[in-house]
Amino acid sequence: MLEFRISGETAKVGCLADQLERAGYVVRRSKPYRNRDEEGCRIYLELDEDKVMGWMLANLEKHP
């Protein structure tokens, strides 16, 4: 399993997390946080390596 951390504006990260969950991935979300420069949250993904490689290759084909 691979684990990634994605940070960003709360709304954008939340939307991404929703899409990933609908695609069948395991997603854990942090509580929203605020620091001097931004407000956001983090999502943690537990991904199967084969699924990740397939997803990356499919996206590379879409965006040459």
Report each predicted region and the residues it spans.
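Long, contiguous binding/interaction regions
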Residues: M1-P64
